[in-house]
Amino acid sequence: MGTEEYRRIRVLWPDHLNLARGKYLPARLAERGTRHCLSVFSLGYDRDMGPTPGTGFLEGMPDMECHFDVSEIRPGWEDGVGVVVGDLERNGKPVPLAPRTVLRNAVDAWTQMGFKPKVGIELEAYVMEPDPNGGWRPYNAPGSMVYGTGIRSDPEGIMQAIDETGERLGFRIESMNGEFDMGQFEMTLEFDDAMRCADEVFLFRAMAMEVAAQKGHLLTFMPRPIPEFGGNGLHVNLSLEDSSGNNAMLDPSTPDGLSALAKSCIAGQLH
């Protein structure tokens, strides 16, 4: 797609904290890209900043450029707004700290060895509702259970709203269900090439949180937002496709079905 059917373009990129940072651009100016301060990579969750190497913090907090392919602009979840994931550069070179740069380098390394990384992501999150003191409390869904569905697990239809919005926008949702604790849900997207999968999950999370906010709730993917409840997982399912399109992790001739490459990958993770 291009910019013609949109009033504004929302250019987003993931930072080192997995926060969706970006800017809105008038559609007529979108092809120029945009700029952001490189030193945002020195921020912590508490907004404290320090002289982190590579962030330009002590060099005047310089700008970096955000570029994107106009053909990758897609319908957003706000009226009249298209959305796209951008790449970060400085002086014509990729920003080393940018997560998309790190992932692209890893994908390129596997490609040079003759493999294509394929990834599937399972997300877990809690829905929170406002409490009388201005904070947040667990979503009141006493009928919820692991693998729960329907109104008993989600009385206000938060997941239904996310699912309907996601399908309308072209997200390839594989499944949604209640998870272990009250107000906890699992959302899974279909398997894909590593970069596309990461971009899809990044945008899906942003969309899901904002759809929940529109309904007056907070959707959080924090590892353990409620100390008394179980934590949220993030499951990364990885395989490698060889030049013939086969799963290079699979070897049916072995007792466990794993190839030598798969065992080497597991050993590397453990190391």
Task: For the regions a language model picked out, list residue spans one by one.
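Short, hydrophobic beta-strand segments
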Residues: 84-90, 185-192, 238
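ATP/Mg2+-dependent ligation/transfer catalytic cores
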Residues: 1-175, 197
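A short glycine-rich, hydrophobically flanked beta-strand micro-motif that places a catalytic Asp/Glu
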Residues: 121-124, 176-177, 218-226
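Short, conserved phosphate-binding/catalytic loop or strand-edge motifs used
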Residues: 123, 179-187
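Flexible loop/turn segments at secondary-structure boundaries
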Residues: 16-21, 127, 182-183, 226-230, ...
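Metal-centered catalytic cores of metalloenzymes
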Residues: 177-181, 194-197
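Accessory "access/gating" subregions that flank catalytic or transport cores
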Residues: 151-155, 159-162, 167-173, 187-192, ...
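Glycine-rich anion/phosphate-binding loop at the beta-strand->alpha-helix junction
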Residues: 196, 201, 205-271
